Amino acid sequence: MEQRRVVITGIGTINPIGNSIEEYFRNLEDGVSGADTITAFDATKFASRIACEVKNFDPTVVFERKELRKYDRYSQFALVAATEAVEDAQLDLEKIDLERVGVVWASGVGGMQTYYDEVMGWAGGIGTPRFSPFFVPKMISDLAAGHISLKYGFMGPNYSVVSACASSNHAMIDAMNLIRWGKADMIVTGGSEAPVIIPSIGGFSSMRALSTRNDDPKHASRPFDK
């Protein structure tokens, strides 16, 4: 079977050194570090108190209030990046067979913040199991892919890839193969995480997987240093 040629037609991002492709590339070229002291929560009692956080992102500016009830932070990032990518590709959705456009999106932990908030809310109560109806939809790792498809009406292949730190790479490989093999004409692919939260930092700290050079965040990451 002859395999189809695959090209990248649009890109988008939101990350610790840029909330758009233009800002990201500019800061990347200038050697800007995204590492700093954690601001998402009080990390003073943690062994590692530094992280690379997304900065200057206000979801209320991007999404309507009723939408935010449905989106964990990792899904918010996914929608921001995917929207920029679709716009960058200059797609004319009225001339595209939406049944041939899919989404393969990755997330290693999905909506861990949602899970943490709901469980802590229950634990701090009187034992009555009162959980938000959005708990499960916000938490599971494949909802970001679903939200992207719902926004644009894409009806092609749609699923999430979870393979730890390789999740996004695997998602992009899957997306490429779906096009090469004729299963889809276009795929929105990538990955998103929102891991700077208490259980994630606490868990990785207990594994000694995070730097404790808290006095020098910009130079703390040195994976090959003894």
Predicted regions and their residues:
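ACP-dependent fatty acid/polyketide chain-elongation machinery
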Residues: M1-E67
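Generic hydrophobic secondary-structure packing signal
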Residues: E23, Y74-A81, S167, A171
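A glycine- and small-residue-enriched flexible loop/hinge segment at structural boundaries
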Residues: A40-L91, S141-M155
